[in-house]
Amino acid sequence: MSEMTPREIVHELDAHIIGQKKAKRSVAVALRNRWRRMQLDVDFRQEVTPKNILMIGPTGVGKTEIARRLAKLANAPFIKVEATKFTEVGYVGKEVEQIIRDLTDIAIKLTREQQMGKCRQLAEEHAEERILDALLPKPKNDWESTDTDTGSNTRQIFRKKLREGQLDDKEIDIDVAQPQIGIEIMSPPGMEEMTNQLQSLFKNMGQAPAKRRKMKIKEAFKLLIEEEAAKLVNQEDLKEQAIEMVEQHGIVFLDEIDKICKRGETSGPDVSREGVQRDLLPLVEGCTVTTKHGMVKTDHILFIASGAFQMAKPSDLIPELQGRLPIRVELDALSADDFKRILTEPHASLTEQYVALMGTEGVKVEFTESGIESIAKAAWQVNERTENIGARRLHTVMEKLMEDISYEASDKSGSAFVIDADYVSAHLDNLVQDEDLSRFIL
């Protein structure tokens, strides 16, 4: 679990996302509160529930990007899902409890990696012995055996060469475990336990024996380390730790929640909107979900919901769900100045990406201050005149601007291009000023 302070989290987010201070501060505090809660006494800790967040803002201003970056910082089970992918229980489609099952699978993978990391040194030793056994087979009969000291010395010589990388390209025959065959079974609601038992049965039936393969020692060493580390991991402890991690540190990011708001009066069941909201209620409030790894309680899982709310309002969510998302954060629409900062300030910004890509062809591209200002202004104008899609408009504008250079780069190695205001004007002015062209091309 991340022990970063709110200030450190915001600083990390600033490296990738421009503006949106309120949203960054809210998610930073929420993430830090996960750590603070774990410092409390066990009895008191159970009473402290997470304050779920609702992020409201137009498309392309950074809501989803905040989620992506937060996932890397959290060092905890994190899942991002689209609310529109789910339907009400009893209808064809994914039910919302699948969110927790997927989150548990992520936690299992995360915990396995952590445990395998702890026993990696021992796994390397075991893998080394298996490679030495392949290089120096043990004698089958007593009369084939040589002097014990000589055999031991030879093994040590080969061990030294192996560690120094002198044998990396030598080929050996080793027995490698075959990957297990996974079978996905769709189950009706309430039948998850039976489905899990069937999957376990098929898994055991489909477990293939180890296969002898010829490969280079360098590749074999990596495979054997993974195999030996997997043997050292206790599967029951792994499941217990993973479920504990989900229950105490799990984070669910619900994107596009505005798309499941009920709009106007409709007849018949609304299985992918209001029905989904009702199914989300017990998850957000706290319930127990059956997974193939065990029972998972959702009482202390943090939920962060986000939506553009262009066709609906937060008040269109059912009241019970509104009450379970107490922290509201409004993200600001992006200005021309924000676009300018997006083009230059973030790590691996758009301009840096194009410079690096063209550099692979031996073409030098330089973006001037005036050129960047013109690109930002053009993107902002198109957003104002047509649909406002936020920072995503920059991708379209930049691709159109760089189209000729990208096409001809492979034939112009050693050339240099300066992207200034005049260049931008020559390539984009017609498209920006003509609303019909802007609508269909940019």
UniProtKB/Swiss-Prot annotation:
Its main location: cytoplasm. GO terms for cellular component: HslUV protease complex. ATP binds at I18, G60, V61, G62, K63, T64, E65, D255, E320, R392. Gene3D superfamilies: 1.10.8.60, DNA helicase RuvA subunit, C-terminal domain (1.10.8.10), P-loop containing nucleotide triphosphate hydrolases (3.40.50.300). GO terms for biological process: protein unfolding; proteolysis involved in protein catabolic process. It is found in: Cytoplasm. Keywords: ATP-binding, Chaperone, Cytoplasm, Nucleotide-binding, Stress response. It comes from the Bacteria. ATPase subunit of a proteasome-like degradation complex; this subunit has chaperone activity. The binding of ATP and its subsequent hydrolysis by HslU are essential for unfolding of protein substrates subsequently hydrolyzed by HslV. HslU recognizes the N-terminal part of its protein substrates and unfolds these before they are guided to HslV for hydrolysis. Belongs to the ClpX chaperone family. HslU subfamily. A double ring-shaped homohexamer of HslV is capped on each side by a ring-shaped HslU homohexamer. The assembly of the HslU/HslV complex is dependent on binding of ATP. This is ATP-dependent protease ATPase subunit HslU. It comes from Shewanella putrefaciens (strain CN-32 / ATCC BAA-453).
